[in-house]
């Protein structure tokens, strides 16, 4: 059950974080009405409980009345799901209508604008449908049955963002929108056909751009668009991307429309390029080419010379050539906005190199055109008067050929970009009909002998299907095209496209355990969780939908592929999901996954119920944190068994001094527990954000203190030493901390070890010559060994060797890891030659695996509460480093030059 309401009074319960907090007038999404007058709901992306007395009770009554009436209309409705997020939802259509409406509600102040936009969109759709019908009629005359059937087929799988309109517009309009997007398939086909690539195609494109602008503004009412953006119907004045391509990737869209973002972004990219391409091809310059350059006869030139109009005509030509060059430059610039290997765009049939080759060819032709235009500019009318007009005519012919070639490249470029983009996103429901000639060509085709990684065999298979499923076509295109990757001799992937990586992930003929770990550790830098699940789920449904009778080897592979699919998802959800389950966005994402598993996966694979139960548990307990638990042992220090800090015999002793009364080994043990507790709760996403800044949105709002003891422990040690007035007592305290370091090294707590050694090497302590001079040789030798271990020389080589050979448990020094990650970020590009740098992610995973290894085994010490509280209190206290240094100068003032010389002479044995 889910509906939206408004708070009528403030509510806050600071004693329990499970309760919701809101103010009067806030919008609340009620998930469930509980017993005893309480509700479970979401407000400001936070979820919790609140009393029903704080909201408008009429909303509850109205909702229940409409809900029960819907039950009466659907007596065969299924029972509610086993968790409260899905309670009382009749079916997925009900959820799409009411759930999306609740999340994406628009404030009343914008209702007028919303209605106007809906009306504009409605009229545009009508105009597009009328134009599409006219285009269809013209195509029928050409006998292209595949296109006719395509435009007349209303797709069942359309872009997901029109579903938002479903909350306010009827189903007939949604069907019309679906038909409009299906008509996008005409663009590449029309560009191939000279007889129909004319006024109808241009009009069709203009209307599509208008519709796209309306949808963009509908989703982004917060963006200030140019004044002409909504009102103008002139294609040349519509810049589909007013400011920047990344405008649609803002946080506001991601927070409210995360599941819609990839579709919208892809659609924007496609329409942006098609806009620039058609803007080029419908430019006035092409009319110039038809009207002026075709009249390049000798008589025409001589006539212009006689009328003294040749110079003006030449200037007009040069001006139009300049406009053409500028227009082509804008088109090339628009193409730069699309990264062919990014997760926001879909795989292409052609490689990125094929597209780049067209760009290079276009650039080369533009350069030639520019040089020839310079030659044309240098020809004067007097040259023609001297019977030298043939050079002028030859240049006109050359320009004409060059312009026709440029136009052909632009059309081909647009066709390739648009068509290849539509393959994966839109080309899902086309069911082509074969003519007799095509059928006869395929009669002798043996599908079982086809190499399935060959595109020709794939096309032959698709053409033989009488009515292929949309999902089947989409996944065949996805699985077997655009799989580009560079594999080293040792079998490791260096660079690859996202398609190649995901296909490799799903392979069952190799041992890809480490590869899976690399991908799941770093997938958030390549693709969103929602997109990844959609792709993996589509693969599974594709395997399930294949006709095993016709494809003999698929039935043999079905269970292996299914098991691989389930294993990946189980590992992903249990250990590698980056989203925190503390907002409505993540909850709805899990809900979507639950429904897919319940409907499509469990019926084919009973073992998937384990994952279904895990998802149900997460939905029941959205505040569950996925973190390692500190292991607890049974060892207890007998030295402190009867120690009671609360009954200290001397109340004058400061708490800092109480620490010095404890045995150094016990202090080291308790520091190990504290340090490991902090270290084990650091999530991998906090390390990944050091490399990919865009992952900061996944980092917990209340971050674990990464350096829980580092700075505080350094200041505590330095202050404790300089607080002692007498040199001998300072020496004893110094020796005490060196002993603690010895035990920390023995227990492999390098984090605390580095902190204390850093404190002993700090200026306030290092300058205390008298204090250091009183240390015995054994303690001093021990310090030298520890100091060499923590030295930064040769990139911490001594420490790295020691860490490699140490036995768990261990708390490493995190500073070295962060340094390594920083070097990886600055020294390795994220993408290389339009492909993902997978080698960079492999190196990152090795670091994360090492950290995870140390996080997996805890210390088998029982924490002593009194000691833990004491250490937490004295270490976490804020200290002023300037005061510490001044105190160091007080206890051991600086030596004068005479005193320093006298000390050196005494130390050398002269006196």
UniProtKB/Swiss-Prot annotation:
It comes from the Eukaryota. Residues 1-60 form the SH3 domain. PROSITE patterns: RASGEF, RASGEF_CAT, RASGEF_NTER, SH3. The keyword Nucleotide-binding does not apply. GO terms for cellular component: cytosol; mating projection actin fusion focus; plasma membrane. It holds the Pfam family SH3_1. Residues 489-623 form the N-terminal Ras-GEF domain. One of its GO terms (biological process) is conjugation with cellular fusion. Residues 663-894 form the Ras-GEF domain. One of its GO terms (molecular function) is guanyl-nucleotide exchange factor activity. Keywords: Guanine-nucleotide releasing factor, SH3 domain. PANTHER family: CELL DIVISION CONTROL PROTEIN 25 (PTHR23113:SF368), GUANINE NUCLEOTIDE EXCHANGE FACTOR (PTHR23113). Promotes the exchange of RAS-bound GDP by GTP. This protein is essential for mating. This is Protein ste6.
